[in-house]
């Protein structure tokens, strides 16, 4: 079984089948220079272990198919 996660490595955002061994989807958010006008930068993808957030990052991980939708998009 391989997990399906949303990913921001493609444009527009798409769903990818995670490689073997990467059994978590993650969402990582942080502010860059354009945060006040564009909002937080959002990165989505697959990981083997949930990354440790840096002090300025928010990281969430989950383990079900497509469980990491873009926060501004409705799951679909």
UniProtKB/Swiss-Prot annotation:
Keyword Secreted in the entry? The reply is yes
Query: What family does this belong to?
Result: Belongs to the three-finger toxin family. Long-chain subfamily. Type II alpha-neurotoxin sub-subfamily.
Query: What molecular functions are annotated in GO for this chain?
Result: acetylcholine receptor inhibitor activity; ion channel regulator activity; toxin activity
Compartments, record wording: Secreted
InterPro entries the UniProt entry points to: Snake_3FTx, Snake_toxin-like_sf, Snake_toxin_con_site, Toxin_cobra-type
Expression tissues: Expressed by the venom gland.
Summary of the function given for this chain in its UniProt record: Binds with high affinity to muscular (alpha-1/CHRNA1) and neuronal (alpha-7/CHRNA7) nicotinic acetylcholine receptor (nAChR) and inhibits acetylcholine from binding to the receptor, thereby impairing neuromuscular and neuronal transmission.
What keywords tag this UniProt record?
Answer: Acetylcholine receptor inhibiting toxin, Disulfide bond, Ion channel impairing toxin, Neurotoxin, Postsynaptic neurotoxin, Secreted, Signal, Toxin
Q: Name one GO cellular component term.
A: extracellular region
CDD domains per UniProt: TFP_snake_toxin
How this chain assembles, per its entry, is:
Monomer in solution, homodimer in crystal state.
Cite the Pfam families for this sequence.
Answer: Toxin_cobra-type
Give the protein name, as stated in the record. Alpha-delta-bungarotoxin-4
Q: Which residues form the signal peptide?
A: 1-2
State the source organism's domain of life.
Eukaryota
Where in the chain are disulfide-linked cysteines found? 5-25, 18-46, 31-35, 50-61, 62-67
Report the principal subcellular site. secreted
